[in-house]
Structures are given as C-alpha cells and as structure tokens.
Amino acid sequence: MHTEKDPNKNTPEQQTPISLNDQMQRRLEERQQLMEAGVNPYPTHFEVTHSSGEIIANFVEEAKTPVSVAGRIMTIRKMGKASFFHLQDSAGRIQIYMKKDEVGDATYDTFKLLDIGDIIGIKGFTFKTRTGEISVHAESLELLTKSLRPIPVAKEKEVDGEKVVFDAFSDKELRYRQRYVDLIVNPEVKETFIKRSAIVSFMRNAFTGKGWLEVETPILQPIYGGAAARPFTTHHNALDMQLYLRIANELYLKRLIVGGFDGVFEFAKDFRNEGIDRFHNPEFTQVELYVAYKDYNWMMEMVEELFSQTALAVNKSEVTTFLGNEISLKPPFRRLSIIDAITEYTGQNIAGQSEEQLRYTAKDLGLELDPKISSGKIIDEIFGEFVEPKLIQPTFIIDYPTEMSPLAKEHPSQPGIVERFELIIGGKEVCNSFSELNDPVIQRERLESQAKLRQRGDEEAMIVDEDFLRAIEYGMPPCAGIGIGIDRLVMILTGQDSIREVIFFPHLKPE
C-alpha cells in the first residue's frame, strides 16, 4: 500500500458524493435531535485523567486501569450492538471499544448521532484487543462538541490491483489557509510545530542559563532601524504621528546595554514590507542577542555551540537534511571573508574596486543592477546571486566592507572592513552578527552617509536616529550582537522546504 495525492480530492467539499451543504444540514439535524433528547452538544467541561499517549506508554497487561480520555472521533466501525472507534487528542490516537449493553440505550442512541470530527469524552478501563492494540473499554460516553463541518478523510482505492491511500487534505494553499484542518488530518504537521516550540525553548533556556536577560522592546517605533529593509507604516491617532512596525530590535537592545545590562535577548516578531516567497514572510520571528565585552569571534563560537546543541536536543543528531542536502551542524564551521568567497565562486577579485569597477564586474557576470545602488549593495547583489546559493554546509562569511554594515565596528587591522559575519546554511542566511560599533562619532558619520544613500534613492538605507546616538554618547561597552532567523532555523532542523510550513498562519493572497 502506498500514499499519494488524489487530484480530485483536495478540498473538504470534495470528500464524498454528498454535497457539503447536505452533510452540514444532516449534522445540524443531528444537533437538533440531540438537544431534543436532552443532550447538550456543547457542555462546559470534562475531567480528563490521561492522554492517549499516557495510556499507551503506561499500559499494563491485565491491570484494567481506569481512565478518562477526551478527543476527536477520527474513525468509526459499528458492528450491531458494539462499536470500535479512534479518538485523537494532542498526544496521538487511542482505540475505543463500546458495547450497547454496557453503556445503556440512551448513551448508545447518542453515539448513533455522532460523526467523524465530533469531540467526545470517554470513561472506562484499558485493555488490549485480540489483535494486540491497546484500547479503552468504554463505560460511559459524553458528547463535548458536535462538529457541523465534516473534516476531510483519507480515501482508499484500488489502482492496478494495488491499494492506494489518497491524501485527505494535501493542497498546499488550502492547508495554509485552513491550518486548523491541516493539524487535524496531517499529524506530521503538528510534529513540525511541536519541534519548533522545542527549538525556541532550548535556545531560551541556553541564553537564560548564561545569565542573559530576556527583555521586550517596542514593536511600534517612531524611527525604524537596525536593518536594511522597508517598513510597514501606521498612524497613531491620539499623538497624530507616523509610526513603523519594527524591522529589527537592534537599536533598542543596544540602549539596554548602555543602561548597564551585560547580556540581553529578545525573541521577537519583526516586519518587513517586502516580497513573499518560500524563504520570506513579511512577519517573521528572530531572536536578537547582545553581550557586553565580547566580539564577533566569540559570537561565532557561541553560535557553533548553540546550533550543535539545539540540533542534538531536538533531533538527537547534528546532521539534518535540508533542500535535499545532508548538512552537518558539528563544529567548527568554515570561515571565509566575503571578498575571498566572491573570488572563489566567481573568479573575480573585487578587493579595492571602486563603484564603477564593481559595476563592470557585475556586468561581466551577467548581473543587471539598479543604477541607484551603491558599492556595498553591488557586492551584496553579487554575493547573493553567485555565492550564497552554493554555500550548503554551515559557513561563516566574515569581514564585510564598511558601507555594507553601518552599525559594525571596523576591523583593527583591515581598513575599510568591519567585524561582521553572516552564517549561511543550505544556501540561505540564518544569522547576522557584528562586533558592535560603539564610537558615537563614527556612528554618526556612518548614519549620515546612509542618509545620503537614501537621497540617491536607496529606500533600504538607514535613518539617523538621534536618540540612539545620544544613548551611545553616554558610553556603550564593547559588545557583540546577533540576529538569528528562527523560521529558517526551524526549516533546517525539520527539513521543510518552505517557510510557510513552519509558520502556523503564513501570509497569503486574498481568497
């Protein structure tokens, strides 16, 4: 037996020859019959003592352990005066066996008005069937929620003499729009999000275990900064002022380092008013961390340890498969300067090239450029087009030109280069980190240069933030900072090929 997608069975409306309206009408009639029989289809509570997983894990032969379990009916097999059915809860599925003679006529009459998708509570005892399946022998049944809309169910057909199970709910866009149905019928989807939660929990515990403080900073900001991106704009009516949804947390977290905290971090929703594809969502999650008295070399070692330990914690292995590639997260990761990386993968040595020379190099490589962009942006375009997709194993790309990194500290022995790295895994950026610039005079010069780039038409150039400059004028200690994209890290550790598979409710075009 194998499973495949049935092209004619993608939506709930197409699951049976009966129309959706007819099915819902029948369920509405059943709801009414239940109410007329004195059964409340939506009671307030039910006492649960065990999950399905606990029942199976703790099963003892012949013990007949009393249990109370609740969940959604996913299969029903009625055999005259007895029935088997499966309940699904957050931990999995458990089979229920029920006999009319034992639960009584009234309860069995209620059961006959139930459908796949209804949520019920069962009290009974554990046993194992003759086929060896751990089950619950029902002594009572209580309806907890009458489902009015039928859920999709897998369909088995015979194709060329072989039994084939067609997916119940496999259309990707429909899955993303109706994630609640996706979670019901596709258990592997739920596992992805459980693993996502475990990844975030492990990282949070790792940070707090080192004494760093978890904080919260503003989402609505009067000046956006900390990244090169276009913001979402809104308006505060009471203050009659324009505000922006944050594109990064960086400048506020640095203010807290100025204020005396040695390490701060924030798991945050950030927003960038840019394109949507399988690696980008306009609303995304990242964690930013800033640690005083450290630099980017220390941060690289911290990231190697963090990613390795996170993989071991959630996958029991430092090896994962992403976009068809086997990737090892075992330290140490390769380190390569951005200039050397471009030379290695394009054959072009761009060290010391002027803006005009960079444009010629890009043209030789077949890259069409916006005439408004500057040298740093040209290098970024060359790297993104010809180098980044080829970096499959974890690679720190280090030592960027100053213009590309206005918030990073200059390298002490390489003029025009800053102490910055990006971590590339599977051809995608996962982290961005600096030794943070803390000289307020140079920081002002850098931001004013960014303002000139905005005047040239670079919408992603940073804005001069006078309050941030005032903060670091009080003195910010040497500091290393990093932003880690949680969505992409989850993709890598769960083997998903789209960011929409790791976000519960991704942004989609209107229906």
Swiss-Prot record:
Pfam families, per the entry: tRNA-synt_2 (PF00152), tRNA_anti-codon (PF01336)
Catalysed reaction equations from the record: tRNA(Lys) + L-lysine + ATP = L-lysyl-tRNA(Lys) + AMP + diphosphate
GO molecular function: ATP binding; lysine-tRNA ligase activity; magnesium ion binding; tRNA binding
Region of interest called Disordered, as start-end residue ranges on this chain: 1-21
Lineage: Bacteria, Pseudomonadati, Chlorobiota, Chlorobiia, Chlorobiales
Biological source species: Pelodictyon phaeoclathratiforme (strain DSM 5477 / BU-1)
Polar residues biased stretches: 9-21
Gene assigned in the entry: lysS
Binding site for Mg(2+) 1: 422, 429
UniProt keyword Cell inner membrane, yes or no: no
Gene3D superfamilies linked to this entry: Bira Bifunctional Protein, Domain 2, Nucleic acid-binding proteins
Quaternary state and interactors: Homodimer.
Protein name, UniProt field: Lysine--tRNA ligase
Entry-linked PANTHER family: LYSINE--TRNA LIGASE, CHLOROPLASTIC_MITOCHONDRIAL, LYSYL-TRNA SYNTHETASE
EC number: 6.1.1.6
